[in-house]
Amino acid sequence: MNKKIQTISLNRKARFNYEISDTYEAGIVLTGQEIKAIRKGQVSLAESFVRPENGELWLYNTHIANYQSGANTNFGEQLDPTRKRKLLLHKQDILKLKSKVMEKGLTIMALKIYIKGHIAKAEIGLAKGKKNYDKRRTIMERDLKRETRNWEKRKK
C-alpha cells in the first residue's frame, strides 16, 4: 500500500555543505500544535542537526512556528519553537548511527521533513563535511549541466 508523501521542508544547505552517505527515515515526537504548524509549512531545517543521547536520537534547532488559531490550544501555552525533539528509529539503526558518529568527522543531519500518510517523518543522513574545493567542483558541475541543457534547447 503506497502512502502519499508530501514534502514540507528541505535542508538544501546540508546537501551542499556535506557529503551524505546513508539516509534513514525517522518518526518525530510532536505536540498537536507542532503537527498543525508543519502541515501549514511553518518549519525550517536551516540550522538543524541530530545528536545521540542515552540510546536515543534527538533533533536540535529545528524551528517549528507556534500554531496560531482562533482558540489557543494547550491552554494558551506557547512552546519553544526550537526545542529538541525525539526521533523514532529502530534500536539497531540508532546503535549503527551512534557508532559511526564516534568516527572522526561524521555527523547526522536532518535533510527533509515530510508527511507520509498522516504522519510527520524526518529524513536524516550520515554526513561528512565537504572541503572548499569539493564545493567549487559541485558548483562547476551544476553550471556545466545547466549550460549543456540550455545548449540542447537552442539546438532544437
Language-model-detected regions and their locations in the chain:
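Ribosome-associated RNA-binding proteins
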Residues: 1-156
